[in-house]
Structures are given as structure tokens and as C-alpha cells.
Amino acid sequence: MEEISLANLDTNKLEAIAQEIYVDLIEDSCLGFCFEVHRAVKCGYFYLEFADTGSVKDFGIQPVEDKGACRLPLCSLPGDPGDGPQTELQRSPPEFQ
């Protein structure tokens, strides 16, 4: 690219140069994204998940279903009244010992 002194250019020329740089950056970004998606599809690690739009609430956040609290063998979940640490461990079935 040729060297241009920016002090001698009027605003129209500066805007034209800025627009050209802007368009080049956008085109390079879009082309790079297209190549990344193409490679992901060809290599098999591009997966799309389609969600039913009826279950999407405000701001596109999926509703969370309460499946109950899980219990860990050596501790209790915070907020469970009266449950202290459980010291007994489960033994494996006899065929695995």
C-alpha cells in the first residue's frame, strides 16, 4: 500500500479510506467464520441443537425443572436440617470385591 500523508487529505478522502478498511475487516471476519463452520462440519464437531420455542421464557432462558436434591455419601447438602455427615460408606457388591 502506498504511503499517504493524512494531513493533506480532506474529510471525504479520509472517510473513503476508513470505509475501505472497515469493509475489508468485515469481509475477512465473515470469510474466516465461514471457513471455521465449514471445517467444523467436515471434521464432524459442528452440532446444532434445536429447542422447542414453546418452552423458552423471558430472554430466551430455558425453564429449569427441579429434579430434587441429590445426596452425597460423605456430606449433606447445605440447608438440610438435622442431617450431619454420613460416616458409613456403601460397600461394593460381592462380585466386585
From Swiss-Prot:
Entry keyword annotation includes Phosphoprotein: yes
GO biological process: regulation of gene expression
Compartments (UniProt record): Cytoplasm
Region (Disordered): 76-97
Main location: cytoplasm
Alphabetical list of InterPro entries matching this protein: ATXN7L3B
Record-level GO cellular component terms: cytoplasm
Modified residues (Phosphoserine): 92
Assembly information from the UniProt record: Interacts strongly with ENY2. Interacts weakly with USP22.
Biological role: By binding to ENY2, interferes with the nuclear functions of the deubiquitinase (DUB) module of the SAGA complex which consists of ENY2, ATXN7, ATXN7L3 and the histone deubiquitinating component USP22. Affects USP22 DUB activity toward histones indirectly by changing the subcellular distribution of ENY2 and altering ENY2 availability for ATXN7L3 interaction. Regulates H2B monoubiquitination (H2Bub1) levels through cytoplasmic sequestration of ENY2 resulting in loss of nuclear ENY2-ATXN7L3 association which destabilizes ATXN7L3. Affects protein expression levels of ENY2 and ATXN7L3.
Protein name, per record: Ataxin-7-like protein 3B
Name of the gene encoding the protein in the UniProt record: Atxn7l3b
